[in-house]
């Protein structure tokens, strides 16, 4: 019997049964619509975007986080230890608001590119494993060596690119390097 047939065949002396039936059907329809709506939501590219899990390590691209506040908010959503890839033109950044969360969550840090003097100085006492590399390939490869099972490798630069690249270009470099590494390790 369909929902509408059930309504038509309901006797007047059963109003509470009818209300209960209608309510449960409406709630079920709402639940299904909510599930469908949520499943259609896509993440915003380069904003806390999951890329892959390689050898038990999860890789996330947060290249849109080109300032301290954006990176801080990303760290608020993370509960696992992090190998943090950051860097760029740090001349305008003030990293003091990140220090506490970095001490709590970051296992190691990889500074990528040029212009990271202020970034390294800000965290050299908080992170025992702090490295500097020249490009994204080196950053991802080093981060994969530093990461342990169930860690997160997070690319969240906390500053603009020193080379004038967009966050999209840097995020794509990160994603391509991770995907290439994933492919090589699973052949």
Where on the chain are the PLM-derived regions?
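A short glycine-threonine-serine/GTX helix/turn-capping micro-motif
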Residues: 2-12
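Short, conserved micro-motifs enriched in small and acidic residues
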Residues: 10-15, 65
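Internal alpha/beta core interface subdomains
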Residues: 15-23
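ATP-dependent carboxylate-amine ligase
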Residues: 22-30, 36, 40-46, 50-187
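Local beta-strand/beta-hairpin segments that build beta-sheet-rich folds
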Residues: 1-2, 51
């Amino acid at each position: 019997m369909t929902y509408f047939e059930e309504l038509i065949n309901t006797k007047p002396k059963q109003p509470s049964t009818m209300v209960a039936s209608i309510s449960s059907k409406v709630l079920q329809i709402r639940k299904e619509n909510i599930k469908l709506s949520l499943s259609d939501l896509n993440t915003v590219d380069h904003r806390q975007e999951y890329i892959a899990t390689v050898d038990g390590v999860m890789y996330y691209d947060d290249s849109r986080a080109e300032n301290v506040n954006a990176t801080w908010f990303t760290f608020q959503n993370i509960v696992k230890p992090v190998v943090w890839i950051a860097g760029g033109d740090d001349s305008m950044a003030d990293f003091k608001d990140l220090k506490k969360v970095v001490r709590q969550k970051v296992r190691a840090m990889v500074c990528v590119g040029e212009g990271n003097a202020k970034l390294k100085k800000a965290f050299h006492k908080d992170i025992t494993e702090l490295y500097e590399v020249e490009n994204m390939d080196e950053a991802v490869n080093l981060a994969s060596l530093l990461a342990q099972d169930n860690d997160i490798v997070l690319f969240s630069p906390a500053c603009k690119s020193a080379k004038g690249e967009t966050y999209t270009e840097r995020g794509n470099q990160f994603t391509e390097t991770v995907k290439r590494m994933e492919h090589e390790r699973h052949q």
